[in-house]
Amino acid sequence: MSLTQEDKAGIISQFGGVQQNTGKAEVQVALFSRRITDLTGHLQQHPKDKHSRRGLLMLVGKRKKVLNYLKNVDIERYRTVIAELDLRK
């Protein structure tokens, strides 16, 4: 299932503060995480879908890059994002 405009707006307002703040690292990580969750569910139902698996791996890589940037720039923002999205233990 793709991300609807309402879902995307909710994620942006939750992590970015205002609707126009889509470039914030926290917003990008949250949107990537939501898309990764949706693709993971799709791949559980369709295990032979190799194209979607590649897209999933690309999204995971993008999220990893943004998280590394956030960790290097501001460790506290990184920790709050990790805690809110429940990404790492």
Curated annotation (Swiss-Prot):
Record CDD domains: Ribosomal_S15p_S13e
GO aspect biological process, one term: translation
GO cellular component: cytosolic small ribosomal subunit
GO molecular function, one term: structural constituent of ribosome
Entry keyword set: Ribonucleoprotein, Ribosomal protein, RNA-binding, rRNA-binding
Family: Belongs to the universal ribosomal protein uS15 family.
Name of the protein this chain belongs to: Small ribosomal subunit protein uS15
Gene name for this UniProt entry: rpsO
